[in-house]
Amino acid sequence: MRSSPSTRTICAQCLSRNRHFSTTIQRCAPRSSTPNPPSPPATGYARLTNRGLISITGIDSTSYLQGLITQNMLITNDPNRPTRRTGSYTAFLNSQGRVLNDAFLYPLPQAEGTSPDEHAWLVEVDKSEVTSLLKHLKKHKLRAKLKLRALDEGERTVWASWKDHSEPRWAAYNLDSQSFSPFASSSATVTGCVDTRAPGFGSRLITPGEGDLTTHLAGAEGEGYGSEVDLGSYTVRRMLHGVAEGQSEIIRESALPLESNMDMMRGIDFRKGCYVGQELTIRTHHTGVVRKRILPVQLYEGSLGDLESADMPVYDPSVEVELPPSGSNISKVSARKGRSAGKFLGGVGNIGLALCRLEMMTDVALTGEGTQYSPDQEFKVSWTGAEDGSSESGEVKLKALVPAWTREYISNGGVKKNQGRNLELEGQRARELLEQLEEEESSR
């Protein structure tokens, strides 16, 4: 979420406060041979083995990407509109404005012997989608002077790193910076960006080879990253923050970018010109109301009264829950038939993500017409064995939760209310923060 001087910000320390949130799910024998992953530490990093990389190099690579992604490849605050040299969250859409792939885009340093205009980029995407995205990219290549290549296994490694106790300024890293990476003393072969999908969510880094992340970070910089955790713990942390990732959660050619929170996550630049899928996205942003959004959910059994009030779910690795199949409909417990309240997207243990009708499953009011929400209303997901390929049917209750930053973004009208902010001043402030970070690193 982009902040302005008139908008309250949420620091990382507030997110890490202990929340007492009880569930009454029966603790039974494990329903699978794999135990739930442990809770994520306050500081740590994870190797994202479920992500793949595509290289795009050539003199036309920047203009080519500008016409395909939701993010702006140019620095709009500069009258010369130079090419952005920072990584960012973005998405590829189809012509109907639906998501093909959520992605991260990273610049690579200029290779020796190439012209200054010959930029190189890495696209990070769901590993199972690399072939499909590469096909999409080749379809739009036409006569553009560039090369496309899927990176080999082990050629580079994708990492997520976080420090829940870190200063809020890390979340203010500006996409218009001229720096390749917010990590000033990193090796020239390392690229990365701040992960803007939730306040204080952490950083994304790409390193060469398969070695440990800290081997690529010199001196004190490498000491503050904590210890490596497995992919499961990263997934838990991501779902606790309500961050969907990959096409098992952001369904290809079905999900809409605003319903997937890409506007709130700074993955869309509404000021940029034409790109594939822009029309529906811009029209919804300016004239429509986003009635559904992806939210974190708490899975439980028993009564709703056993759940204490909170704005984020609480993960308990000892709780075993049989998860519904992805895409299962959410309905009211009291209703046999009626309008679907949303769709379950995925989960780990007793937490998950769901696409929720806000005015039905939460107290968020989008218009002045009132809502269908009742604090006593319970919701469930029911499924049959035929849906998940098993011989058994199942049912689990869930409660949608609205993180504080999501509620604030919606109540403020999102970026529409912030259109009058001083973008030049914001860019200058971010550059000053980067310079301060570089000075601190060099003085250590």
UniProtKB/Swiss-Prot annotation:
SUPFAM superfamilies: Folate-binding domain. Residues 1-28 form a transit peptide. Transmembrane segments: none annotated. InterPro entries: TrmE/GcvT_dom1, YgfZ/GcvT, YgfZ/GcvT_CS. Keywords: Mitochondrion, Transit peptide. One of its GO terms (molecular function) is transferase activity. The keyword Mitochondrion applies. It is found in: Mitochondrion matrix. Pfam families: Beta-barrel_CAF17_C (PF25455). Its main location: mitochondrion. The keyword Mitochondrion applies. GO terms for biological process: iron-sulfur cluster assembly. One of its GO terms (cellular component) is mitochondrial matrix. Residues 26-45 are annotated as: Disordered. PANTHER family: TRANSFERASE CAF17, MITOCHONDRIAL-RELATED (PTHR22602:SF0). Belongs to the GcvT family. CAF17/IBA57 subfamily. This is Iron-sulfur cluster assembly factor IBA57 homolog, mitochondrial.
